[in-house]
Regions:
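Short, low-complexity N-terminal tether/leader segments at secretion or assembly junctions of large
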Residues: 1-20
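A short tyrosine-centered beta-strand micro-motif
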Residues: 124-126
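Solvent-exposed serine/threonine-rich low-complexity stretches and specific carbohydrate-binding patches
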Residues: 141-149
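Short, surface-exposed beta-strand/strand-loop-strand elements in extracellular ectodomains
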Residues: 137-138
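Collagenous Gly-X-Y triple-helix signature in extracellular proteins
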Residues: 18-114, 120, 150-151, 155-392
Length: 392
């Protein structure tokens, strides 16, 4: 049975010192298990002194407050992650026990064309690679006419959903990446009239301001640039959480309605959370493979960290946390069903995001199936989140 710790308020300096001295004395007498941390600051001191191992075990739980709700965190690792600040080398990793109450979009469908300079009113056309979704890609070339200019820094979108004929979709023009009201919406016809904008492919042609067609339809699986990463590390109120990270970026579905994940969190809890150095694979379709490195307060776990193995050979996105490897139903890291990976939202097992991309796609992201098996989901879908962080 795991232990659960909840802190109501901060201690005075004298109380902190008395508690710390009692911990030290008890540990010397091998009685550490009889004591509990009494505050977030006290817990941080125990982590930094490497005494937390005597008191807190893997799967023990901590409770903290976010606005009017209590969030329960599991201890999933100790001294497992690398603090971003080199003056510290000790850490204790926490992850939400259940999913956050609201499912979140990883990243929104993106613009297909970026207007580096003003795009005058007139007729244009673009091609979608004939080998891509040939069932619904039913024009050899898509022609449209703008009656109003698009300013420099503006975008064109083509919101082509799944299992829909592309010929039925309208081109939307926007004055900027943050604008949510189109300048105009115009129908497409088959034709090659006017100026050619180029060919949309899965790889994209970023240098010529053309996005990957997969990201145009389903959003981006690049975690470093993702909307969900911004949400996780924001303490801002709704409407102020998201800003464009690329020239093709578009506002996520929650941009105007969701406070940042850190918004309303217990200040004493936030004071002990340090930035963690994390590694994320890049897809091999339009991001060139390899990996990105970043330092974040809150982060999603990689598929490897939840005991599912590597997405890309040679890219190590962290190591399996003891919580996932030690309590797994599986005898070795694998992608099959695992009850230890199941997480609930609203009392029901639900999908939840990893940060790892599905490497063979520009838009799909690894996720955990309600059975605990490996899955993937399109970035634009709202899926559960179970963030992690480190007391450092």
């Amino acid at each position: 049975m795991s232990n659960q710790f909840g802190f109501v308020s901060e201690e005075t300096y004298a109380e902190k010192m008395d508690t710390q001295n009692r911990f030290l004395a008890a540990i010397v007498e091998n009685q550490g298990g009889n004591l509990k941390p009494t505050s977030w600051a006290n817990t941080q001191a125990l982590v930094r002194s490497n005494l937390i191992d005597k008191i807190v075990g893997i799967a023990d739980q901590f409770t903290m407050q976010r606005s009017s709700a209590n969030l329960v965190w599991d201890v999933i690792g100790k001294n497992h992650d690398t603090p971003a600040d080199p003056q510290y080398d000790k850490s204790m990793t926490l992850q939400l026990h259940d999913q956050f109450p609201t499912a979140m979009q990883f990243d929104a469908p993106e613009a297909f064309y970026y207007c580096e300079t003003e795009l005058p009113a007139g007729t244009y056309h673009f091609v979608i690679d004939s080998t891509y979704d040939s069932t619904y890609n039913n024009y050899s070339s898509y022609q449209f006419t703008l009656t109003q200019a698009v300013p420099a820094g503006g975008q064109l979108t083509f919101p082509w959903g799944s299992n829909v004929n592309a010929s039925t979709i309208k081109v939307n023009s926007f004055a900027s990446a943050t604008s949510t009201t189109p300048i105009e919406q115009v129908a497409v016809t088959q034709g090659t009239g006017g100026q050619g904008l180029g060919t949309l492919t899965t790889a994209g042609d970023f240098a010529n301001n053309l996005n990957s067609i997969q990201r145009v339809r389903y959003g981006s699986n690049n975690y470093k640039e993702s909307a969900i990463r911004q949400w996780l590390n924001s303490d801002k109120a709704k409407g102020n959480v998201w800003t464009p990270q690329t020239k093709f970026d578009r506002p996520p579905s929650w941009a105007a309605t969701a406070d940042g994940f850190m918004y309303g969190m217990d200040a004493d809890f936030l004071a002990v959370i340090g930035k963690t150095h994390i590694i994320v694979a890049r897809n091999t379709v339009c991001d060139g493979g390899g990996y990105d490195e970043m330092d974040d307060y809150f982060f999603l776990l990689s598929r490897r960290e939840v005991y599912m193995g590597n997405e890309v050979s040679g890219v190590i996105e962290g190591e399996p946390y003891p919580y996932y490897s030690d309590y797994s139903d599986l005898s070795a890291a694998g992608t099959g069903a695992d009850s230890n990976r199941i997480k609930y939202r609203g009392g029901t097992a639900q999908y939840w995001w990893n940060r790892t991309p599905y490497a063979g796609s520009g838009s799909h992201v690894r996720s955990v199936h309600p059975t605990g098996a490996m899955n993937y989901s399109s970035a634009y879908i709202s899926v559960g989140v179970a963030p992690a962080c480190n007391i450092i």
